[in-house]
């Protein structure tokens, strides 16, 4: 049986991790299990021990750290949070994927220690909306809300440490994005093509219809500019059409994950508009696109 994977869904407090995960867990094709965290904070109204959290004392939490019973842990606003190791490892062996709904500090620990991980950072649409969501819970005073917002300002720049950055503008849109990411990563039982694969077909159509002149010139340019044997070999084997299609597909996909209506990725006019802007950023005189992973691309 293929081993499951730890799926980190992290982001600042109030971004909506719980709401998104609750919807994801309803889909049996995702093979998801929820890792119940351990915490020293008091239960909120409606929270159940062993379901929402394992509520423990400070002494019990400290003992779990000493005994290496936690995959990660963090301390914040006078409380401690951690992920019990035993349950996660049991579910992974069964072939299930385990959601770790954790704060950014804990996610950083897991990313530094564990290899079998898929990491997703949930972004709020803006800081005003984040503040509204935290206040909407009506569980904390203004001092604690301010502390959470201050921490969010430090956490959001760390989003680049994650494999995927996904905006939670509304739960349905965020769930659709994460579902496709899990499908793309081969972690589901879904049989239909991914949105990414269907997007790639649309991009291929657009490139063939509108950009083959640039493709052909690109291949010619890199051959003419090759200065040494290594560059000449790269130029000789350079398939500009395939490279451009994959490059544009990845950039359009990730841009919409980060902001936008996910269903638009199957709208040819929308994709065409995105590609028009991206084409200005490509260096048609080099095989290497040094700014490829840059947000400015």
From Swiss-Prot:
Recorded GO MF terms: ATP binding; guanylate kinase activity
UniProt keyword terms in alphabetical order: ATP-binding, Cytoplasm, Kinase, Nucleotide-binding, Transferase
Pfam families (alphabetical): Guanylate_kin
EC number: 2.7.4.8
Annotated ranges, domain Guanylate kinase-like: 4-183
Binding site for ATP: 11-18
SUPFAM superfamilies in UniProt: P-loop containing nucleoside triphosphate hydrolases
Highest taxon listed in the record's lineage: Bacteria
Catalysed reaction, written as an equation: GMP + ATP = GDP + ADP
InterPro entries attached to this UniProt entry: GK/Ca_channel_bsu, Guanylate_kin-like_dom, Guanylate_kinase, Guanylate_kinase_CS, P-loop_NTPase
Record CDD domains: GMPK
Enzyme class: transferase
Residues covered by region (Unknown): 204-297
Keyword Flavoprotein: no
Similarity comment: family membership: Belongs to the guanylate kinase family.
Function: Essential for recycling GMP and indirectly, cGMP.
Protein name: Guanylate kinase
Protein source organism: Mycoplasma capricolum subsp. capricolum (strain California kid / ATCC 27343 / NCTC 10154)
Top-level taxonomy: Bacteria, Bacillati, Mycoplasmatota, Mollicutes, Mycoplasmataceae
Name of the coding gene: gmk
């Amino acid at each position: 049986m293929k081993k499951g994977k730890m799926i980190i869904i992290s982001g600042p407090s109030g971004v909506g991790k719980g709401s998104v995960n609750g919807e994801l867990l309803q889909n049996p094709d995702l093979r998801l299990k929820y890792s119940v965290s351990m915490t020293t904070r008091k239960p909120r109204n409606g929270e159940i021990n062993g379901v929402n959290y394992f509520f423990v004392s400070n002494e019990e939490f400290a003992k779990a750290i000493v005994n290496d019973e936690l995959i990660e842990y963090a301390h914040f606003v006078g409380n401690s949070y951690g992920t019990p190791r035993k349950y996660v490892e049991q579910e992974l062996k069964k072939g299930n994927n385990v959601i770790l709904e954790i704060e950014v500090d804990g996610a950083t620990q897991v990313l530094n220690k564990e290899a079998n991980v898929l990491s997703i950072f949930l972004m709020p649409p803006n800081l005003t909306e984040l503040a509204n969501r935290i206040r909407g819970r009506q569980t904390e005073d203004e001092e604690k809300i301010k502390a959470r917002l201050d921490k969010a300002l430090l956490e959001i720049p760390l989003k680049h440490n994650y494999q995927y950055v996904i905006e939670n503008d509304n739960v349905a849109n965020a769930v659709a994005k994460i579902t496709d990411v899990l499908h793309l990563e081969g972690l589901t039982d879904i049989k239909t093509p991914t949105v990414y694969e269907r997007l790639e077909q649309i991009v291929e159509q657009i490139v063939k219809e509108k950009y083959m002149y640039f493709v052909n010139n690109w291949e010619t340019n890199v051959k003419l500019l090759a200065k040494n044997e290594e560059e000449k070999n790269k130029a000789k084997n350079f398939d500009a059409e395939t490279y451009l299609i994959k490059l544009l597909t990845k950039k359009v996909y990730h841009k919409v994950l980060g902001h936008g209506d996910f269903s638009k990725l199957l709208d040819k006019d929308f994709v065409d508009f995105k590609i028009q802007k991206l084409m200005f950023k490509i260096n048609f005189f080099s095989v290497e696109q040094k700014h490829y992973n840059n947000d400015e691309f």
